[in-house]
């Protein structure tokens, strides 16, 4: 017999929906927005590394990094 906990009772409805697909777009727009924001983040990091994005008072001298 499985132990019944308060947390298990709270999470039970989420497990009951397992395998069901919501018709329509669902959370696709949120996922797309998250991917775009992550891409922008990566581009900013790349530009800082490549020194094509200059930030005041931030010295990017990799020779003296250690």
From Swiss-Prot:
InterPro entries: PSII_PsbH, PSII_PsbH_sf. Coiled coil: none annotated. The chain crosses the membrane at residues 29-49. GO terms for cellular component: chloroplast thylakoid membrane; photosystem II. PSII is composed of 1 copy each of membrane proteins PsbA, PsbB, PsbC, PsbD, PsbE, PsbF, PsbH, PsbI, PsbJ, PsbK, PsbL, PsbM, PsbT, PsbX, PsbY, PsbZ, Psb30/Ycf12, at least 3 peripheral proteins of the oxygen-evolving complex and a large number of cofactors. It forms dimeric complexes. One of the components of the core complex of photosystem II (PSII), required for its stability and/or assembly. PSII is a light-driven water:plastoquinone oxidoreductase that uses light energy to abstract electrons from H(2)O, generating O(2) and a proton gradient subsequently used for ATP formation. It consists of a core antenna complex that captures photons, and an electron transfer chain that converts photonic excitation into a charge separation. One of its GO terms (biological process) is photosynthesis. Belongs to the PsbH family. It is a single-pass membrane protein. Keywords: Chloroplast, Membrane, Photosynthesis, Photosystem II, Plastid, Thylakoid, Transmembrane, Transmembrane helix. This is Photosystem II reaction center protein H. It comes from the Eukaryota. The keyword Transmembrane applies. Pfam families: PsbH. It is found in: Plastid, Chloroplast thylakoid membrane. GO terms for molecular function: phosphate ion binding.
């Amino acid at each position: 017999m499985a132990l019944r906990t308060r947390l298990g009772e709270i999470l039970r409805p989420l497990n009951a929906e397992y395998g069901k697909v919501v018709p329509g777009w669902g959370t696709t727009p949120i996922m797309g927005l998250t991917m775009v924001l992550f891409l922008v983040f990566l581009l900013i990091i790349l530009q800082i590394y490549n020194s094509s994005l200059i930030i005041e008072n931030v010295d990017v001298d990799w020779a003296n990094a250690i």
